Amino acid sequence: MKILLSTLCTVAILLGLTGIPCSAADKIRSLCEIHYPTDYLYEWDCVKVTGKDTPYRIFGKQWQDGLRFNRMDRRHFLAGMSVKVPRHMEDIKEFNPMPPFYLDSGKEPKVILIDQNEMYLGAYEYGMLVFSAPVAVGVEEFRLKNGSYRVDAVDLRHESSLYPVEGSERPYPMHYGLRFHVEKVGDGWTSYWIHGRDLPGYPASHGCIGLYDEEMQLEYYGEPAKPLLMDAKTLYRWAAGEGSAGNLQRVRGPMVIIMGEPQIPPERVRPVPDAADAPGVSRGPEAPR
């Protein structure tokens, strides 16, 4: 029955027949179960979060590094969740698992490298890393094929035309949107974006790539009170330029390279509906999601 429901759900989304996201069948409760190649460079303990815990209480002054190490945001740091806590926090100062150089970028001035095995993104200028960030990637049945893409449109305040915020009629926010792929699906077109969203610490989207956007979380969910994690904004400004207007613009932006596979049993997770995570379905490549 679960397989049938999952299949029907997938078909409905791809054909644009449903207006609400499919519910998550299983949400990961232990991020210790997810293994990254760089995990083995550090000594860490699996710690179960209690109702009194905060990122600062668990990770100390390097709480942002601790969240990045777990590829999660503050909204998902909840009681009952198990997280990886490095025994020596100084070892993950300014945590970054991406290589300092990407020599395969050729003559491309800017490249966005998305390593799904690490669930991390690196921004490169002429092969040199200038910025990195944890990401939320697609679950198996929605995940894009590894390969080369290119940012062809930007939209500062992009919103979903397919899904509303859960429990409301307000469109899902996909702020700081960088569109990097459009493909024909049935009678429509599906678009994929890099944009701000929730980061639960495991694959959770319908194909888009998500980064920290605590300004969006405060606006739509009322927390955190003081936005600090703003990787989506940083990447957008780097890719689109400081002078980019707020409306949808066609551009020839950075090359996007997707590689690797998340190291998690695919049956454990389904798309999570509490974030702007679904690709767009439109009637032509010019129509934004």
Label the predicted regions.
Residues 89, 95-140:
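A structural motif detector for short, solvent-exposed N-terminal "entry" segments of globular domains
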Residues 1-6:
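Positively charged n-region of N-terminal signal peptides that target proteins for export
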Residues 81-83:
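Structural motif
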Residues 7-16:
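Bacterial N-terminal signal peptides
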Residues 50-77, 131-132, 222:
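LysM (lysin motif) carbohydrate-binding repeats in extracellular/periplasmic proteins that recognize
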Residues 10-11, 21-23:
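Cleavable N-terminal signal peptides
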Residues 26, 162-289:
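Exported/periplasmic cell-wall-interacting domains
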Residues 29-62:
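Primarily a LysM-type cell-wall glycan-binding module
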